[in-house]
A protein has these predicted regions:
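Secretory/extracellular carbohydrate-interaction modules
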Residues: 107, 121-137
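Short catalytic/ligand-binding loop motif for oxyanion handling, primarily in non-cytosolic enzymes
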Residues: 40-42, 128-133, 207-210
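Terminal, low-complexity interaction segments
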Residues: 153-233
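Bacterial Sec-dependent N-terminal signal peptides
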Residues: 2-4, 10, 16-40, 227-233
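Short coil-to-beta strand junction motifs in C2/discoidin
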Residues: 134-153
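Extended extracellular/luminal ectodomain segments enriched in beta-structured repeat modules
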Residues: 115-122, 195-196
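N-terminal targeting leaders for non-cytosolic proteins
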Residues: 25-115
Length: 233
């Protein structure tokens, strides 16, 4: 009798453990800028805006101080800074209408919610028309890129203001026999950054002068993908 009761008690305990065990699922969020209200051939109307789970802004209310705007510009031929809001592809990633334009120093936040902190998975990146044509044709300040030249954006993750990791993306690379000048949207693996609540962008180039980098410090971004583990009962 005692043996039977013991077996029954263990069975009930095991069932209770299984029934109380929490299950989880992976939720994916993609920031594609299509939810930002704006007109065709324009940029975001305010100095800060929200897309998906992320907050974007320009610095000190002026883009010349750096930051990120949402853009629907599609000019792939006009040279110079007056065309600073266009991607060289003429559209967002996957032929979408809107995308982000980063001018250094740029950053965005993706605050934790009731389910915790987001993990960043990937992002699509391409050149701005301004930077692309400057490297291709040269300008008053920048040179025509040739053997040995390069231009990159450094994407760095932070969690509670502590750096997690960084990923370098070459927007132009003429080293070691290569002749890459990015003109398409490229998907970048950012899983090395891990869990983040903010992301920053910095730029570097082989073309430097007395006052620093000559290459226009711009990049276009789209389809920022995050994942989050959610507990389900």
């Amino acid at each position: 009798m005692k043996t039977t009761n013991l077996i029954l008690s263990l069975a009930i305990l095991g069932f209770s453990f299984i029934s109380c065990k929490q299950e989880t699922e992976i939720n994916t969020t993609v920031v594609d800028f299509e939810d930002v209200a704006m007109n065709p051939d324009s940029i975001s109307k305010t100095s800060s805006f929200i897309s998906g789970n992320s907050n974007f802004s320009i610095n000190d209310d002026a883009f010349w101080n750096g930051g990120i705007v949402s853009s629907s510009h599609n000019d792939t031929v006009t040279i110079g800074y007056k065309n600073q809001y266009s991607s060289i592809t003429g559209s967002g990633a996957l032929n979408s209408k809107q995308y982000g334009v980063v001018y250094s120093p740029g950053s965005f936040t993706c605050p934790a919610n009731i389910n915790g902190t987001y993990s960043i998975k990937s992002m699509m990146v391409t050149n701005s028309t301004y930077a692309y044509l400057d490297m291709k044709n040269g300008s008053v300040y920048g040179k025509i890129f040739a053997t040995g030249d390069w231009f990159k954006v450094i994407i760095k993750g932070f969690k509670t203001k502590v750096p997690t990791s960084n990923v370098e993306v070459y927007l132009a690379d003429f080293r070691d026999g290569k002749s890459i000048l990015l003109k398409t949207w490229k998907k970048i693996d950012l899983s090395a950054l891990g869990q983040v609540d903010s992301v920053t962008f910095a730029f570097d180039s082989s073309d430097k002068g007395q006052f620093g980098m000559n290459t226009p410090a711009y990049a276009c971004i789209d389809n920022i993908e995050f994942t989050q583990t959610i507990s389900i009962k």
